[in-house]
Amino acid sequence: MAITIVSVRARQIFDSRGNPTVEADIKLSDGHLARAAVPSGASTGIYEALELRDGGSDYLGKGVSKAVENVNSIIGPALIGKDPTEQTALDNFMVQELDGTVNEWGWCKQKLGANAILAVSLALCKAGAHVKGIPLYKHIANLAGNKNLVLPVPAFNVINGGSHAGNKLAMQEFMILPVGASSFKEAMKMGAEVYHHLKSVIKKKYGQDATNVGDEGGFAPNIQENKEGLELLKTAIAKAGYTGKVVIGMDVAASEFYGSDKTYDLNFKEENNDGSQKISGEALKDLYKSFASEYPIVSIEDPFDQDDWEHYSKLTSEIGEKVQIVGDDLLVTNPKRVEKAIQEKACNALLLKVNQIGSVTESIEAVRMSKRAGWGVMASHRSGETEDTFIADLSVGLATGQIKTGAPCRSERLAKYNQLLRIEEELGAEAVYAGAKFRTPVEPY
């Protein structure tokens, strides 16, 4: 007899920042329980699908009881008796029929909330894998039509700035990528060792409290300027003995410091500053070019504001061969925005965040489009995470080639990296690590 859904329940749990988030349980007719929880971001793109929050004074307005109620009273009852392997049909049913809200960029989930729909979509995917009797990553690969499983290069966010940290640093993340490793296991070793060397370098230079960690496990020393962050990474990589094997990535999150006067304020964290560090998009582009010529930078994410298509296109055409230009706030994992960016040659890599778009099916579509355009793809956590490890399987199943889920520190970050270690072990001799081919690890599917 076919295995079907017998119940769908959601509850409010807490993310790694102590904010409420949604968790969903799907019970199947064979007694199996599939559970998934959704994350939430600090620097969010204005084009992301709606994350439904309660407002009011409870939990400082961040409660999710409405989203939970939407799962329990609207989504859940509508899925009873359905086949959990029908991911695409059920995602489309939730998004287009049960919710049905649309804006210029497509299905915006304004009625039920992307957090409500996604919790169920992720749990459905886990339930579907169970019914098929295969690991989650294989089920995801099958849903996408991908034949090649690949372990991603981890991009460890080891120095935090921007909206994630209380220092003066404008740029949000400085990452290390062990592209020279021969396996994911070795990449973890390299990443952890560089992280510990970085800790001692920072402690020596800035003092003990500079090694306190931020939301994603990285350090937030009192760095005065962005170049200093790059210099610290270069030193730590050298001390660990991995020069040439471990390279650098940045997430600038430039929308956070773009002003109405169309300038970028590199001193945005100092209130009422004199404006002396405001620069034009053109000047910022040249700053990135100078960074890329001085340091082993392979990836720059969100280098400009989410509506500054012009400078995105310029930077991509000028250094896009050598450095991948990643769209996060620009694209918000939205197939329609990906399409526009492909046409305008605005960037050449997608940051994949399932909770920006709100369903597994739409996420897969954004990835397939990106791959067909010859782009790179980086799977990503959010700054407010849970112990859920779905994105580890997603990254392998879609052969993204890259994943960023924080520093090798804090359990909600390690949960994903540890799951990738398990997957690599399970694949045994068939395991392939993306390594130097992290931008195009497989043929488009």
Swiss-Prot record:
The active site is at E216 (proton donor), K353 (proton acceptor). GO terms for molecular function: magnesium ion binding; phosphopyruvate hydratase activity. Keywords: Cytoplasm, Glycolysis, Lyase, Magnesium, Metal-binding. Homodimer. Pfam families: Enolase_C, Enolase_N. Disulfide bonds: none annotated. Mg(2+) is required for catalysis and for stabilizing the dimer. It comes from Ricinus communis. The keyword Ribonucleoprotein does not apply. Mg(2+) binds at D251, E301, D328. GO terms for biological process: glycolytic process. Gene3D superfamilies: Enolase-like C-terminal domain, Enolase-like, N-terminal domain. It is found in: Cytoplasm. Its main location: cytoplasm. Pathway: Carbohydrate degradation; glycolysis; pyruvate from D-glyceraldehyde 3-phosphate: step 4/5. One of its GO terms (cellular component) is phosphopyruvate hydratase complex. Its EC number is 4.2.1.11. This is Enolase. Its cofactor is Mg(2+). Substrate binds at H164, E173, E301, D328, S380, H381, R382, S383, K404. Belongs to the enolase family. It is an enzyme of class 4 (lyase). It catalyses: (2R)-2-phosphoglycerate = phosphoenolpyruvate + H2O. The keyword Metal-binding applies.
